[in-house]
Amino acid sequence: MKKVTAMLFTMAVGLNAVSMAAKAKATEEQETDVLLIGGGIMSATLGTYLQELEPEWSMTMVERLDGVAQESSNGWNNAGTGHSALMELNYTPKKADGSVSIEKAVDINEAFQVSRQFWAHQVQSGVLHEPHSFINTVPHMSFVWGDDNVNFLRARYTALQQSTLFRGMRYSEDHAQIKEWAPLVMEGRDPKQKVAATRTEIGTDVNYGEITRQLVASLQKKPNFALQLNTEVRGFKRNADNSWTVTVADLKNGEAEHAIKAKFVFIGAGGAALKLLQETGIPEAKDYAGFPVGGQFLVSENPDVVNNHLAKVYGQASVGAPPMSVPHIDTRILDGKRVVLFGPFATFSTKFLKNGSLWDLLSSTTTSNFMPMVNVGMDNFDLVKYLISQVMLSDDERFEALKEYYPQAKKEDWRLWQAGQRVQIIKRDEDKGGVLRLGTEVVSDKDGTIAALLGASPGASTAAPIMLHLMEKVFKEKVASPEWQAKLKTIVPSYGTKLNGNIEATEQELQYTSDVLGLKYDKPQVVDEAPKPQLKPQVQPQPAHKAVADIAL
């Protein structure tokens, strides 16, 4: 009996020792210089920059799903537009005197040129390969109808001619000419309808998911880079030396937790970035809240449709709709196949990610951001009405919207696709309590040890300049050093300069990136004469007709 008891005791001690060793291993700390949270294009872009700027730095990327680029960066979850303001009318708002402001359009275009240079450099460095797998020439068009909208497009076209970045843009109000540019848009249209269009040949369709996969695949070839999939962030702890200990769970291994100690943490988790930023406890996070809006598209893969449309055609947002909600009918090249998408139609879910939780919105609401959210809701009732009307749309109503851009569309050629979630930024404001912010914001602590990217637009197309801005903010001294300056100018030749206003530099950059990326580019030859716009000063808006706040879909 004593022998049996002794044996059982020995086994118990042994099992306990094994258990303790397993727990010790589970809580063992992994160390890394840079921790990238989220396997999307932002983390992949930042990681690629840092790998070239500081090749000795160790990096770890964690992603909750079982592969990278499966959320917002996925080609099917976004519109795939290389946003350069060539056709997006919301980037050129009308001023009080009736003229058109182009400042935002110039900024957006400059930013996209940085992305083009970044991608071209990665192709030349062997990081990206087969450019046609991720970027293709697809002309960008604006198309409008009705006297007021035609007059606006005239004014927009005239104003954009003042910028060197928009040289080569064509303009027409002729049905036959526009039909040559976009047959589907014009066939079956009333020949008496007053229409106008602009067209820029150098527009692009971009598969941001493919770019992300290729960037991460290249990073994985480096011995000091680690990718951990099926890994969810569970907590943050700031250490005395200003580093961070981040607790993560292995979702494929019984949610076993382990810790990663990092000198710098980037939260590039799309819609989940806000909640993770809040969990860090940094005071800067208290200024922000988020409101999720989803998007749906009608998709056609019918060759009769696909082969007769090669353009991205953006219209004008209807009265009472946010400017960014502008409908568009787009050629997309996804996984080597051409398709046509029309939309977006706004949807609502409390999830912050397509693969998120229905509790996301509630769990991100805190005592510090609740009132700003209430203030935004009360101050933007027209936006709330718009979202409700979108959610209530029937299939027939969506199809009628499509027929405004494709009069001879057949219902059987189209199916509805749910794209990704876009979390809009709500920021605390001293005067209004809270404001809805269109765009992206880099939020970091004062020491530059942790940073998050919030917001949704223009998003992926400006990943390269956004991550440049982030590095200028958190690695200020490094960016100012001669070593980093030289490398950054190798990656982005125009870094530190403006292309706008310099015809020679603009043409040189477009020619270089087009050659490397396999894109179409012909130097501009002629300027179309457009009828002179009638500038109509805006009547002082009444409170009931306040402009609808903008959101990204």
From Swiss-Prot:
Q: Name one GO biological process term.
A: tricarboxylic acid cycle
Q: May I ask which residue range the UniProt record assigns to the signal sequence?
A: none
**Cofactor or coenzyme needed:** FAD
Residues spanning the membrane: none
Q: Where is this region: Disordered?
A: 534-553
Q: In which pathway does it act?
A: Carbohydrate metabolism; tricarboxylic acid cycle; oxaloacetate from (S)-malate (quinone route): step 1/1
Keywords of this entry: FAD, Flavoprotein, Oxidoreductase, Tricarboxylic acid cycle
What Pfam families does UniProt report for this protein, alphabetically?
Answer: Mqo
Q: Which reaction does it catalyse?
A: (S)-malate + a quinone = a quinol + oxaloacetate
What top-level class of enzyme does the UniProt entry assign?
oxidoreductase
Composition bias of kind Low complexity appears in 534-543
EC number, UniProt record: 1.1.5.4
Kindly give the InterPro entries that the UniProt entry links to this protein. Answer: FAD/NAD-bd_sf, MQO
An example of a GO molecular function for this protein is: L-malate dehydrogenase (quinone) activity
- Assigned protein family: Belongs to the MQO family.
PANTHER family on file: L-2-HYDROXYGLUTARATE DEHYDROGENASE, MITOCHONDRIAL
List the NCBIfam families hit by this protein, alphabetically.
mal_quin_oxido, PRK05257.1-1, PRK05257.1-4, PRK05257.2-1, PRK05257.2-5, PRK05257.3-2, PRK13339.1
Q: Name the chain's protein.
A: Probable malate:quinone oxidoreductase
User: Which organism does this sequence originate in?
Assistant: Citrobacter koseri (strain ATCC BAA-895 / CDC 4225-83 / SGSC4696)
The gene that this protein is the product of is mqo
